[in-house]
Structures are given as structure tokens and as C-alpha cells.
């Protein structure tokens, strides 16, 4: 159970420019020109929220060219904006011939979390400035996969 406490803050009357997107599903087959289109949509936002499934599968983590392009995209975006990333089920699991295997891409996400301006749910899940307060939540691997398989066995 998640305990949510109510907090009330007077953050001022300034406008906040933020964007939310999710389910990019970046993969080996992803057309990288789309990253430029996405950047052009995001570049004027102060805060960007990526709500899971940035990756299609963690296979892209092992493709050095694709991995580097995604890292460079995140670095470029985070130079202009604060970027908050919550990991989704595709970000956590490695697909291998239509089967899911336990998460082992921690090195990639640790690298992402070290980019200035990036806040990743796994490593730095709280952010506050004079305009916004952010709490990032992330479900663990078992939430997506273990429980799903156990419930199928009950049927």
C-alpha cells in the first residue's frame, strides 16, 4: 500500500511549461529521425515527464549505436529541461524469443541517472524547486511479471 500524505505549498503564481509522454518504445528498428521531431516538441518545456517504456525492450541497451543515440538524445533534452523518468515494464525486462527475463540493465539506467538534469525513479525519485515538487514512483519487476504469471496459474 502506498501512503500518500497531503502537503500544501504556495509555489508562486508563475506559469509552468511541462510535457508528459510515455511509451516511446525505442528499439533497434526505431527511426532515429523521430528523436529530432520529439526534441523539437519538447525543447521549450521546463519540465519533461517520461511515463515509462522509454525502451521497447532492453535489447537496445546492448546495441552500442542505438544506446549512444538514446543517451545523446537524453543529454540534449536535459540541457534545456529537467527530465523525470519513471521506468515501465519494457524498461525493466529483457525479451528473449518472446519470453521475459529478469531485469539486468541496471548499468544502463545508472548511466542515464548520472546525466545532469535527469531524475530517474530508481535512483533519485524526489525533486523540488521554487515551482514544482515531484515524487517519482516505480513498480518493481515482480509487479509486472511474477504476479502476472502466478495469476495465470490460478486460472
Predicted regions and their residues:
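A generic local structural motif
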Residues: 5-7, 34-37, 70-72, 151-155
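Acidic, histidine-bearing metal-coordination/catalytic regions of metal-dependent phosphoesterases
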Residues: 1-30
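Structural motif
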Residues: 16-18, 46-47, 132-134
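Core catalytic region of metal-dependent phosphoesterases/phosphodiesterases
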Residues: 26-128
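Short hydrophobic segments within beta-strands
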Residues: 21, 51, 86, 135-137
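Short acidic-hydrophobic surface loop/beta-edge motif
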Residues: 5-9, 124-130
